[in-house]
Amino acid sequence: MITLQNVVKEYTSRNNKVLAVDHVDLEIEQGEIFGVVGYSGAGKSTLIRMFNGLELPSAGTVEVDNLLISQIRGSKLRKARQQIGMIFQHFNLLWSRTVAENIAFPLEIAGVRGEKRRFRVNELIRLVGLEGKENAYPSELSGGQKQRVGIARALANNPKVLLCDEATSALDPQTTDEVLELLLDINKRLHLTIIVITHEMHVIRKICNRVAVMENGKVVELGDVLDVFRHPQEKVTQRFVRQVTDSDETEELIHLLLDNYAEGKIVKLLFMSENATQPVISQVAKENDVMLNVLHGNLTQTQNGAYGTLYVQVLGTEDAINASLTQLRQLKVETEVLER
């Protein structure tokens, strides 16, 4: 659906060259929700603007639905953009227009007239849950309602791709979740490919199938969301994952557990989706005659499944403890004995 090959974006300012996007390669499948996460200055917003030709690459190619966006110009590019909707952090609504008129705007530009345009506007208002707000102005809407207008407007011409540039960054947590649920629903109903740019790992965890982590213009990590959460490789990825896992990996927690539970062994357990909700702990304790004392843990849900992390104290004979760890591994639970 979307292919980026060796994409580079370089800016020149006062004889200084800034490499905003540094040789990025990506393949995004039709119908998936793909996340790009990074801190400010990582290059993620520059990257997404090349998907619809708002920015042109200095080198490399950007292909969307078999069309080389990086090489077309003029009317061909304008027509291609009708198939690539976009929503923004600050909504970018026309304040002198009502909700219905804002949604109708791209239809007007596309030459859709009369009853056909009114029908499409009403259809979109129902899709995003704004019934009764048709004649309201942006100043009368909440932040979440404004973003719903932005989403409806972006979908007006039945695009195949929806770009979301920090679309929830200006919203409170509850409204953020409501907008994310709406995007999930739209993805499932319309089989729409959605690209999400964000600095919030909660957004990635909640709706994305795959994620690319950017730092200094490069994609430093790429994979299924569940795999990235389980085994983050890069330091920047580990920092992002800790946003939504309560800092499980902090040295402070590990030292606290080792200092306060001197008997037996302290073991970190990592459960995957197939066993994250099963009574594995009680089964292993019973069959190996050990006591398993749960000290700390959490369960994280992603679009690819759930995974859980537990820190447990294992009490029993040396042979029984080793047998229990062996059985846990056989049950596809990853184990790590913490060293004192």
UniProtKB/Swiss-Prot annotation:
SMART domains: AAA, NIL
Function of the protein: Part of the ABC transporter complex MetNIQ involved in methionine import. Responsible for energy coupling to the transport system.
Subunit annotation: The complex is composed of two ATP-binding proteins (MetN), two transmembrane proteins (MetI) and a solute-binding protein (MetQ).
CDD domains in UniProt: ABC_MetN_methionine_transporter
Gene Ontology CC, one term: plasma membrane
Family assignment from sequence similarity: Belongs to the ABC transporter superfamily. Methionine importer (TC 3.A.1.24) family.
Gene3D superfamilies referenced in this protein's UniProt entry, alphabetically: 3.30.70.260, P-loop containing nucleotide triphosphate hydrolases (3.40.50.300)
Matches recorded under InterPro entries: AAA+_ATPase, ABC_transporter-like_ATP-bd, ABC_transporter-like_CS, ACT-like_dom_sf, MetN_ABC, MetN_ABC_transporter-like, NIL_domain, P-loop_NTPase
Membrane topology: Peripheral membrane protein
Keyword Membrane attached: yes
Location(s) in or outside the cell: Cell membrane
Enzyme class: translocase
Positions contributing to ATP binding: G38, Y39, S40, G41, A42, G43, K44, S45
Keywords, in A-Z order: Amino-acid transport, ATP-binding, Cell membrane, Membrane, Nucleotide-binding, Translocase, Transport
Domain ABC transporter intervals: 2-241
GO-annotated molecular function: ABC-type D-methionine transporter activity; ATP binding; ATP hydrolysis activity
Catalytic activity: L-methionine(out) + ATP + H2O = L-methionine(in) + ADP + phosphate + H(+); D-methionine(out) + ATP + H2O = D-methionine(in) + ADP + phosphate + H(+)
EC assignment: 7.4.2.11
Protein name: Methionine import ATP-binding protein MetN 2
